[in-house]
């Protein structure tokens, strides 16, 4: 019985985290989706980065954009900076791990593009460096963070968007992040394609 209760606890915590996010984040998520659509309609692209589970989320987001989410549509310009093992290992080896995303942002990012920066702690140094690089390239930033937003919260400019999940446990933050990513994909499709 103890194990069942432990398992149930995960579901209960996840529901509570999502309930809290639903109370405080929809307006910010909608604003982020509008920013993404504006970027894409102006022939910009969205670069996404993160570490570990956040790297998987960055890749998941890019796949939904380039492929499709739930509706058929042409591919949308998005790229995960966490998937090119040659670039990641070359930059990490020749420079340092803190620059694995920022070097790619400086090489690929342009004025009008967006950076989707994911960090559950808000303190991932390579994501912070990517945000600095995006600002240098005149790119907007949408940051998905957790807890108190960490150092990333302090880097946001008036043009950037911080979507912060105000819970402590990393697993719960990640679960809310993937829900936010799906909500962003759905909102982008809704604005571009209309429908129900």
Curated annotation (Swiss-Prot):
Cofactor comment: Binds 1 zinc ion per subunit.
Record CDD domains: SIS_GmhA
Binding positions (substrate): 51-53, 64, 93-94, 119-121, 124, 174
Cofactor section: Zn(2+)
Pfam family, one: SIS_2
Annotated localization: Cytoplasm
Protein function: Catalyzes the isomerization of sedoheptulose 7-phosphate in D-glycero-D-manno-heptose 7-phosphate.
Similarity annotation: Belongs to the SIS family. GmhA subfamily.
Protein name stated in the entry: Phosphoheptose isomerase
Organism the protein comes from: Laribacter hongkongensis (strain HLHK9)
């Amino acid at each position: 019985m103890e194990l069942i209760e432990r398992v149930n606890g995960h579901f209960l915590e996840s529901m509570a985290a999502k309930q809290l996010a639903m109370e405080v984040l929809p307006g910010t998520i909608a604003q982020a989706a509008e920013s993404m659509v504006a970027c894409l309609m102006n022939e910009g692209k969205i670069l996404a980065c993160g570490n570990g589970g956040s790297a998987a989320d960055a890749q998941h987001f890019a796949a939904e954009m380039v492929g499709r989410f739930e509706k058929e549509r042409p591919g949308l310009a998005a790229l995960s900076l966490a998937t090119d093992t040659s670039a990641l290992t070359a930059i990490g080896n020749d420079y340092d791990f803190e620059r694995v995303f920022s070097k790619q942002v400086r090489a690929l990012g342009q004025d009008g593009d967006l950076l989707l920066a994911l960090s559950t702690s808000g303190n991932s140094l390579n994501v912070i460096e990517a945000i600095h690089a995006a600002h240098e390239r005149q790119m907007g930033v949408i940051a998905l963070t957790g807890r108190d937003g960490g150092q990333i919260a302090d880097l946001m400019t008036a043009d950037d968007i911080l979507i912060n999940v105000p819970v402590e446990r990393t697993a719960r933050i990640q679960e809310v992040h993937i829900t936010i990513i799906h909500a962003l994909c759905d909102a982008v499709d809704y604005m571009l394609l209309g429908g129900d």
